[in-house]
Structure formats: C-alpha cells, structure tokens
C-alpha cells in the first residue's frame, strides 16, 4: 500500500535521524583523528535485499557509494536468512567496497521477531593495515597490507578471536585499529536499536514498504532530472600527472537517452604497476557523486538514485583495475571523476556544473616508534587539499 506524503516525510526524517545517530556513535567512540575529525567514513541502513535506503549526512562519496553498491557481495556470501542475531560481517576487499584495504566495512543484521529485517553498515579508514599502506609506489595489493575477505567477525554475539588476533599481529597500531573496529560494531548496534524503537513506535514489522516507497520516488526524481538533459553524447578528457613523465588520461563520454544516463570511460589509460589504480566500484562511486552534484543535488542518495545510471570502464584500465593491482592511492586518480563528468556536461548544463578544482587529495602519513618500554609505535594521517572550481555566478 502506498504511503501518504505526510507519513512518508515523518518516517523519512526518523530514518535519517537514525543513520545520523549511527554515524555520531562511530565518530564519538573512535580512537583516531581520521574518523573523529576528518569524517573519513560512511554509515547507512539497507533493506533485506541489500538496497541502501538512507545514509548519514557525514561521510565521503568514496565510502558511501561503493558500500551502497557493495552490499550485494555481503548477501551473496552470507544470505540474509542464514544470519543470526549478534552476527557481524567484515571485509576490506578493494573490489567489493571502498577500493582500498585501509577502508574496513562492517555490516550488522537487525532482527525483529526472529527475522532479519535490515542491515546497518559503516566503512571507515583504519589508521594502519600493515604493509606499505597508502604508498603510491606499491606494485601490487599484496604489498599494501592485510587483505580481509568477507568474514564473520562476530558469530551470534561471540567475537571470532582468531580474526582479531590476525589483525593485531599485522598492524603497527593495534590498540587504535582494534578500538576503531569495536567503534564500528557499536555504531551499527546504535543504529539497530534506534530502528527497532522507530518501528515499534509506528507499528511497522519491517522497512520493506518504506524502502520501496523511498527508493521508487528517488528513482523517479533522478529520471526526471536526466530527462531534462537533451539526448546526446557529451565528451571530455582529463590529463593528470602520472609517473615517469607519463600522464594519466581519463576519457569520458556521458551518453543521455531519455531518462537513462551512461558514463563510459573507454579510451582511458591502462592500469599501471603502481598504487594509483582504481577499482570500478570506486570509479562508480565518484562518478555517481559528480552526476548527482550536477543534475540532482537535492535528490536523496540511495539505491534509487543509482538505477538510471550505468557506469563502465574497460577492464584493465586505470578506472577498472583488476586484481592484484595496487590501489592504495586510488583517490589520486578517482577523485578526478566528478570534474571529468562535469566537463562533459558543461555544454548541456552550463549553469549547473562546476569548474575543476583541486581534485587530487594529498594524504600525509607519519609512522614511527615512541620509544620507551614496549617500543610502542604510532601513526598519524592528515589530509591536504586546495580550493574548488567556480560555478555560474559563483566565483
């Protein structure tokens, strides 16, 4: 049964408040500045089918959008009806979620009356993951650190201690890394508690009908925004610094046909034996972000906003690198996708797109030994970036 507009607005506001509280719990309990202060994270709620329904206002496109499209991998490995109350799942597989092994994604099912009704998930940057980490001169993902396939981190409420032991043994800052993992677990629990309270208050058994309504309306709004663009192929090219005096080229074609939009990166540079390659899910995440900023910034970001958009890049290219390519510095290339898309749409949407700015974020990481008893090590990461480009009427 369709939900009336007033009720939908109330339910939507409560859902957003729920995921915002989830993110706030992660930030307030985190052991690291990269989560607490930089907000290098994502938090969201998914329905039983793995569709993202709502995301927190705090987060980055490189975390939230790959996590949104990546939940299908969790449910393929652990079908929803095989999960138990108290289960928690984890992975840092770059080709499943955020395209970098420093980014840990943790998902938790929510149960009501013995049935899994939703999942809460979050993704944030681990202070250290062993190996060479963010170094752009890694030759393969094997050099970059500890690679965690999709695993059950907590089984029916009991910590799977061998996994925690493996993580501790492979990272330079185990207290902070393990501490943040517990923060991620707690954040999902906070979201689950708020969701169950919200469902009880409104007499709902699950979020399926609400999810359908939100996602369908979002898709319709996104399609309406695409339909306002004249049909055609819109092209752009971006050249950025590479290595050994070999620039990296991003070729982009935005193809609009009716209420469907395709972004094709055919012609872009091939993947390289260095850590600046980008997995396709990260390319999709930042491309979707660029599209939404240009044509529909007011439309919610959920599974519905992804449906009308198709993003492709040739396998083995810099924007669709294949395993075991090194991807630790994928942001050095992937962050240029939004500007490349907007450059392509400049003729069609001159008053909506933004000129390119300082797209390539600069991460600085310090590691060392504090000295004294135990030879405890430290690590610290900070971000540096420049200004953004101008827009029509906004220098």
In which residue ranges do the predicted regions lie?
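Glycine/proline-enriched, intrinsically flexible loops and inter-domain linkers
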Residues: 1-85, 90-395
